[in-house]
Amino acid sequence: MGDLGGEEVTLDDLVEREGIHYKKFTDVPFTGKVTGQEQGTFKNGKKEGPWVDYWSSGRLREKGDYKNGQKDGSWESYDPKGQLRSKETFENGEKEGPWVFYWDNGQLLDKGDYKNGKREGL
């Protein structure tokens, strides 16, 4: 993915209206980079490409990709101590494919498969 250009802001500099993000006091959908606790890129007011979110401690909280404002592909989430909590897969914002959840000690808690946002095999 090439550089989308635009400016660099924090999420606090943006407002969301009907699923589209705008820089405060403007009517133009935001295109540019977001820095701070949550980091990634907006294209035409929607999250696009790789995003990361950090706990206030600076440890990684969540990482994955967005496509046209929707979670898409593999996502991982972590607890405040940095322990992996889940591996999830999305397609167009819906749960799709394998999901795995872990206990605080790293042991497997649960796993399953999703299709069209619904868990299969239940």
What is each model feature region?
Residues 1-122:
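Glycine/tyrosine- and acidic-biased, solvent-exposed loop/turn segments at the edges of beta-strands
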